[in-house]
């Protein structure tokens, strides 16, 4: 085999170069060249975002290698991959903050993993990716010195010798005003209550207001008339103080049912005894009349039979 790599457009046969490789599952992945064996004409390819145990030796003229496709340009203004490390340390840029807005910043250092250590204009230091950094316009680079921290420049004059005036269109002032307005809105707004806290409040209110059961309703319905009766009756003699006894109307108190039933029974018994006495009188008169009638009949029979017996005796 040739000791020189072939000329394949879009692929640079160098250690660290990026390309796409086909794995054993017939899927393409972005990869990176780890080692090159010029004697055998093959390369050790590492699949990005995968463990090194999946690294594989592939011949440099294999169909399993192809140029890395360019990713779609993002709205942030990403350029070609060749401009990955286009920024330099100490350069003024626009860096993205957590609110997805870009603010003036300064690159402090460039890290090996492709990230940038950035210091914002208010002194906050963060580590950002390349996709979260934009180039600052040339006409705005001079205006940053009017609002930058003292550590950016003027180390010999800590009191602040940078007295550049701000224009009416200074976007840094606009950024600060927007940040102040956002802070005021945050402090002015009331804190939102979650749905769980509202549910807890409803539960507490339900605990205080219990719905009475059927048994409780019946018991209360029975007791309420008794209570009303008790309320109608006078509780003490204090209510009649200052009134004459003659003028006070007599109170008719309702009698209990037991006394009424006893009176009814007594009345029924008395009436029954009276009826019985009447019946006894009537039966006595009837019996006496019956006895008198029987005696008269016997006498008549005797008077009729006596002459007959005498005739029979005489005939004998």
Curated annotation (Swiss-Prot):
Gene Ontology cellular component list: nucleus
UniProt region (Disordered), positions on chain: 183-237
SUPFAM superfamilies per record: Tudor/PWWP/MBT
Keyword Aminoacyl-tRNA synthetase in annotation: no
CDD domains: MBT_PHF20L1-like, Tudor_PHF20L1
Subcellular location: Nucleus
Residue spans of biased composition, Basic and acidic residues class: 198-218
Chief subcellular location: nucleus
Summary of the function given for this chain in its UniProt record: Is a negative regulator of proteasomal degradation of a set of methylated proteins, including DNMT1 and SOX2. Involved in the maintainance of embryonic stem cells pluripotency, through the regulation of SOX2 levels.
PANTHER family the UniProt entry points to: PHD FINGER PROTEIN 20-LIKE PROTEIN 1, PHD FINGER PROTEIN 20-RELATED
Protein name: PHD finger protein 20-like protein 1
Source organism (scientific name): Bos taurus (Bovine)
């Amino acid at each position: 085999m040739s000791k020189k790599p072939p000329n394949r457009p879009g692929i640079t046969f160098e250690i660290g170069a990026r390309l796409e490789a086909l794995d054993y599952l017939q899927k393409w992945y972005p990869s990176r060249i780890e080692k090159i064996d010029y004697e055998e004409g093959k390369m050790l390819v590492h699949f990005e975002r995968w463990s090194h145990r999946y690294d594989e030796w592939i011949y440099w003229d294999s169909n399993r290698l192809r140029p890395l496709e360019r990713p779609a340009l993002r709205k942030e203004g990403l350029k070609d991959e060749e401009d990955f490390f286009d920024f330099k340390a100490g350069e003024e840029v626009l860096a993205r903050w957590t609110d997805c807005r870009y603010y003036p910043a300064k690159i402090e250092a460039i890290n090996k993993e492709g990230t940038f250590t950035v210091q914002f204009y208010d002194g906050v230091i963060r580590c950002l990716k390349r996709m979260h950094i934009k180039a600052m316009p040339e006409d705005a680079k001079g205006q940053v010195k009017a609002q930058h921290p003292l550590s950016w420049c003027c180390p010999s004059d800590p009191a602040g010798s940078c007295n550049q005036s701000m224009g009416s269109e200074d976007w840094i002032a606009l950024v600060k005003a927007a940040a102040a307005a956002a802070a005021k809105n945050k402090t002015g707004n009331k804190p939102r209550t979650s749905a769980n806290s509202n549910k807890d409040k409803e539960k507490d209110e339900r605990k205080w207001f219990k719905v009475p059961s059927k048994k409780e309703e019946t018991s209360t319905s029975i007791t309420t008339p008794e209570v009303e009766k008790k309320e109608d009756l006078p509780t003490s003699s204090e209510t009649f103080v200052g009134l004459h006894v003659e003028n006070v109307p007599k109170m008719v108190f309702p009698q209990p049912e037991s006394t009424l039933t006893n009176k009814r029974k007594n009345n029924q018994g008395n009436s029954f005894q009276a009826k019985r006495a009447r019946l006894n009188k009537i039966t006595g008169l009837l019996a006496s009349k019956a006895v008198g009638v029987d005696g008269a009949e016997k006498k008549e029979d005797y008077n009729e039979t006596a002459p007959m017996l005498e005739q029979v005796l005489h005939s004998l």
